[in-house]
């Protein structure tokens, strides 16, 4: 399973990566997890080799997660898209790009 984590905050990427690796290793699921600090770099990589799952922060420097998701959907309609954010303000926009889940960073800490 090829997974992308797109977030401009390194600590957030590392935290999510560690959680994912822990969960998947317990289930003996092989994953290839790649991290990107901005939407532009991620989109370039996604065009070369698509991802199965994409965790995408909405609030990033440069292009935001909504714009990145819209661009992604032009070339990849199949990946599971999960927004990571501390706010639900953009939930409706998330559904417009077929995001399956709005994952809030605060909820993961509970």
List the predicted regions and their residue ranges.
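Conserved small/polar residues in nucleotide/adenosyl-binding loops
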Residues: 103-109
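A short, hydrophobic beta-strand element within the central beta-sheet of small alpha/beta folds
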Residues: 57, 78-88
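Two-component/phosphorelay signaling modules centered on CheY-like receiver
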Residues: 9-34
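Acidic, metal-coordinating helix/loop segments flanking the phosphotransfer/catalytic sites
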Residues: 35-53
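Active-site residues of response regulator receiver
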Residues: 7, 57-58
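The feature encodes the CheY-like receiver
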Residues: 61
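Acidic catalytic/metal-coordinating carboxylates
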Residues: 38, 64-67
